[in-house]
Each structure stands twice: as C-alpha cells, then as structure tokens.
From Swiss-Prot:
Its EC number is 6.3.1.5. SUPFAM superfamilies: Adenine nucleotide alpha hydrolases-like (SSF52402). Mg(2+) binds at residues 37, 147. This is NH(3)-dependent NAD(+) synthetase. PANTHER family: GLUTAMINE-DEPENDENT NAD(+) SYNTHETASE (PTHR23090:SF9), NH 3 /GLUTAMINE-DEPENDENT NAD + SYNTHETASE (PTHR23090). The gene is nadE. InterPro entries: NAD/GMP_synthase, NAD_synthase, NH(3)-dep_NAD(+)_synth, Rossmann-like_a/b/a_fold. One of its GO terms (biological process) is NAD biosynthetic process. Homodimer. One of its GO terms (cellular component) is cytoplasm. Keywords: ATP-binding, Ligase, Magnesium, Metal-binding, NAD, Nucleotide-binding.
C-alpha cells in the first residue's frame, strides 16, 4: 500500500509543477493551521518546489498548540515558513461591524459565532493572497473530499484558493499520506479541528464523523441519522461549489 501511496504522491507533485507552469507562476504557498490536511499539503508543495514554496502560519487568537503544531509541521517538511498574527486585525474589523450594526439595532447575536469564524477564514485568505501576489506564487488549498462534499469550508475563506491537490482524498487517505510524508506524530494524533473557538471540533460541528462521510463517498451503507446529516450538509452547501447565480437579461 505504501508503494501505491508514494506513486500517487509523485503524481500530485508533478501535477503541482504543471499547475505552476501553466499559470506562469514561480511557486506555491499554503496556510499551515497545525492540522493534518495543511500538513500534507505543506509536504507536497515542498516536494514540488523545494526552493519556491512557503508555509504561512496565521494565528487569530489561536491555541498555542495549533501554532506549535504548525511550526512542527513546517520543520518536519523542511518548508520555509513565516508567521503573521492577525488577532489585532480581526478584532478591529469584528468590533467595527458589531458597533455599526448595533447602532442601527441590526446586530444578530445568534449569528455572532458564524460571523466571527468566517471572518477569521477570510482574513487568512486575504493575507495568503497578499503573500502569494508578492512572490508570484499560487495559493494552495487544503480541503479534502469529505470537506468539499459537505461544504465544510468557508466560502471565499479557506475555500478561496487557486488549486486543490488533495480534493479527491477521503479523510482516512489523508492520514495514510501523512504517515508516508512524515507528518509529526503530534499532528497525526490530534482531533481534527478548525480552531475556530475553544473546544471546537470538525465532527462536533458537522454533526457526523469523517468515518461515515468517507464510507458514504465510497458507496457504503451508513446509519440513517448520519446519511440524513450528510445529505443536508451537501444540499445546503451547494452554493459553495458553484459560481454565483446571475439572471438572464433580455
């Protein structure tokens, strides 16, 4: 199995080089969150462009562990990295939005967490593109097949990228690749989380498990409760996977 995974890794590495050539770019950059998906992508882009790849760690009131795991990942992959703390910028934008909406008695407290977490993802996206534009690099996404199918990403946030090298990998395959690529044990063993708030986990937020999503994507039978959740997530996130609608005029 390891041999097959290595063959697939080599194929994706060559694909990454081809994408950069076709775009007339010079290299690749990725946001390193301290999680498994970004760790795999960081290792892949380092293999594709040893001298022209950059990891960017973008904490926004993030846990110390996430930052530590991001650094561990970069060091394990051997990829050059920078850290840009966006906590102050996030506070500035969030506070201004809340203040102005409150002035008009429009602020919806029930949507504050969604607003806050999506703002974090979009600030990171904007910053990644600022870095990429300066270096003439492409921004590489980290979403896997389970996340894309369920829409577990922020529109124009972590979903705002140039290329998606692991979009066809189910979550368990991401772990298999991570082991072959030498991703640190600390990252392999941590519970998947977007780090959006204290105690937040991917599976807790989605309402189902990656195991069941992977099995669903492979056409296997899963519990009815989880099937209902997955189908609802897919249906409600259709707008994230398509161009914005526009009317036909005339």
């Amino acid at each position: 199995m390891t041999q097959n995974i290595q063959k697939n890794i080599d194929q994706v590495v060559e694909w990454l080089r081809e994408q950069v050539r076709n775009a007339g770019a010079k290299g690749l950059t990725v946001g390193i969150s301290g999680g498994i998906d970004s760790a795999v992508v960081a290792c892949l882009i380092k293999k594709a462009f040893p001298e022209n790849s950059l990891g960017v760690i973008l904490p926004i009131k993030s846990s110390t562990k996430d930052v530590e795991h991001g650094i561990l990942t970069a060091e394990a992959c051997g990829i050059e990295y920078i850290e840009i703390d966006l906590g102050e910028e996030h506070n500035t934008v969030a506070n201004k939005v809340v203040h102005q909406l409150n002035n008009k008695n429009l602020f919806n407290t029930g949507m504050e967490r969604a607003m806050d977490s999506n703002l974090r993802a979009r600030l990171r996206m904007s910053t990644l593109y600022a870095v990429a534009n300066n270096l003439n690099y492409l921004v590489v996404g980290t979403d896997n097949a389970a996340e894309i199918y369920t829409g577990y990403f922020t529109k124009y946030g972590d979903g705002g990228v140039d290329i998606l090298p692991i979009a066809s990998l189910k979550k368990y395959e991401v772990y298999e690749w991570a082991k072959v690529l030498g991703v640190p044990k600390e990252v392999l063993e941590k519970e998947p989380s977007a780090g959006l708030w204290e105690g937040q986990t991917d599976e807790g937020e989605m309402g189902t498990s990656y195991k069941y999503i992977d099995e669903f994507l492979e056409g296997k039978a899963i519990p009815e409760k989880d099937l209902t959740v997955i189908e609802r997530l897919h249906r409600n996130s259709a707008h994230k996977r398509t161009m914005p609608p526009s009317p036909k005029i005339g």
